Amino acid sequence: MPRKGPAPKRPLVNDPVYGSQLVTQLVNKILLKGKKSLAERIVYGALEHARDKTGTDPVITLKRALDNVKPALEVRSRRVGGATYQVPVEVRPDRSTTLALRWLVGFSRQRREKTMIERLANEILDASNGLGASVKRREDTHKMAEANRAFAHYRW
């Protein structure tokens, strides 16, 4: 445990192309092995692809996709007297955004399209329409929390 308390959060810089912090977070989630310019190329390409398919602002499409993927509840393990319970808890807004981006990127990497740009673009489009694996992940998380609602009084 650090003695000085938690490290201060560094402010996110707005994205230079779209002027959005969400796009910056998405670039950072795509990033592998420090290749930031490649990650930016993938994200910008995916957003252009989404613009071509929908004809609307890609940042609005991304926000709509994230709203469909963000979880409101999740389960956390809590050990009580030798038994481990899955206790449903509400998700903080910053964590829900982080989880949504993580799921979008993770499930877009598992898709079958040829390039990562197409995969990410199609996962964003599917999520904005309420489809796709990342939306299913959110539904599964909510179902798990609902199923363990009886243990909600163990919340901390």
Curated annotation (Swiss-Prot):
Top-level lineage group: Bacteria
A Pfam family of this chain: Ribosomal_S7
Keyword tRNA-binding: yes
MF-aspect GO terms: rRNA binding; structural constituent of ribosome; tRNA binding
The family this protein is said to belong to: Belongs to the universal ribosomal protein uS7 family.
Subunit structure: Part of the 30S ribosomal subunit. Contacts proteins S9 and S11.
Gene Ontology CC terms, in alphabetical order: small ribosomal subunit
Keywords attached to this entry: Ribonucleoprotein, Ribosomal protein, RNA-binding, rRNA-binding, tRNA-binding
Biological processes annotated in GO: translation
Functional summary from the UniProt entry: One of the primary rRNA binding proteins, it binds directly to 16S rRNA where it nucleates assembly of the head domain of the 30S subunit. Is located at the subunit interface close to the decoding center, probably blocks exit of the E-site tRNA.
Organism: Mycobacterium leprae (strain Br4923)
Protein known as: Small ribosomal subunit protein uS7
Coiled coil: none
Gene name as annotated: rpsG
